[in-house]
Each structure stands twice: as C-alpha cells, then as structure tokens.
C-alpha cells in the first residue's frame, strides 16, 4: 500500500510569510465570498481547497461546514482567474460573486487557515430539516427601492446594533443585538403574524445572514 503525503497546513510563521510577500513585490487582492450548499464531506472539501489555494499563494480565514463556505482571503492579483477556476470546479460556486475590498492590504492575511465548523455562521438553530439552499429572492438596487415604497413591506436589518445605529433604512426593524443568533428569535417573534400577508425584505452587510 502506497501512502501519499500532502501538505494540508501552514508551514511558515506569519513573520516569515510577511517577508516573503514583501520580497515578491506583487499586488495582492483582499476579497470575501460565501455560498450555502449541502457539503457531504466537509473535511475532504477543506483539504481539497487547501491544496488548490496553497498552490496559488492564497491566504485567508475560511470556514467550511456541511452547510457551505464563508471566506475572507488575500490572493495575488495575477492569480485571480486561476483562483476563480478553483471555485468553479464546484457547481454551487459557478459564477460566484467575489467581493473585493475597497482598499487592498498586502498583509491582510498571513496564513491560509481553513477550519471545519458545525456551521459557517452561528445561528443557534437545531433543526435538521432546515434547508440552507432554500433561499429567498435576491433583489437588485432598483427592485429593492421599489419594494421599500410598498406599504405592504416589512424591512429587517440583520446587522448588529452598532452597525444599524450608524444608519439604516427608514422604518426598518433593528434588533438590539450583538450576534446573528440573538436576532433570530426576536425577529421571528416580531414577524410571526405577518409571514403570509407582507413582503419581508431583509438586508445585512455581506448577505450571509439575511440569505440564511
């Protein structure tokens, strides 16, 4: 029996990686993305991603679970298309939106850390029948503005209280919470009488909360 050895974890310290990045002198992009999907083997998924991304000098903090992936990353700009190809190997990430940071910091991440977790975003739900792939309708900006003008619409801000306090849409429900899992029972209670007769519109920072 042949045993194959694969590098599935970091071998460099953050300090060593920072020196390598500076010496390379190449522009890096900071980006984030997420996707909900039914992952049969999260550990294998994690290992496959590490091998593919380590080869592209991709760094970042990534969580994978049986419900999908949530990633914040730094990659060399010249490897962007190759990186996208590693995503599109998976049907659920074909055409995925990569959110690029407004300002790019070459040292935003100094290790490639991919962790297998129970969930990609903690929600406090213990419901095996909950289907993360059964999502609502994504609205473009024009559609969002139009539905906000409908008096039959209820708007929910799924961000933390310190974000909604800075600014939020008019008449939005803004739970006084610090975590997503805290907001769910509060919002569910407030909306229980309107689930069938109102337009329920939700927004959050990156989409991962309100999509769930």
Label each PLM-derived region with a short phrase.
Residues 3-212:
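Cytosolic catalytic domains that perform sulfur/thiol-centered chemistry
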């Amino acid at each position: 029996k042949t045993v194959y050895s694969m590098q599935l974890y970091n071998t460099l310290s953050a300090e060593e990686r920072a020196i390598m990045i500076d010496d390379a002198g190449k522009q890096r992009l900071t980006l984030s993305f997420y996707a909900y999907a039914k992952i049969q083997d999260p550990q294998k998924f994690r290992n496959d991603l590490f091998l593919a991304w380590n080869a592209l000098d991709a760094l970042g903090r990534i969580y994978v679970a049986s419900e999908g992936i949530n990633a914040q990353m730094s990659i060399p700009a010249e490897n962007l298309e190759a990186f996208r190809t590693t995503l599109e190997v998976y049907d659920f990430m074909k055409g995925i939106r990569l959110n690029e940071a407004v300002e790019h910091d070459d040292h935003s991440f100094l290790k490639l850390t991919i962790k297998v977790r129970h969930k990609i975003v903690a929600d406090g739900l213990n419901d095996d029948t909950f289907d993360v792939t059964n999502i609502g309708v994504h609205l473009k900006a024009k559609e969002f503005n139009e539905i906000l003008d409908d008096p039959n619409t209820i708007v929910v801000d799924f961000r933390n209280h310190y974000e909604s306090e800075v600014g939020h849409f008019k008449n939005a429900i803004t739970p006084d919470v610090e975590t997503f899992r805290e907001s769910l029972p509060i919002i569910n209670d407030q909306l229980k009488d309107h689930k069938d007769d109102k337009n329920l519109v939700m927004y959050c920072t990156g989409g991962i909360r309100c999509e769930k």
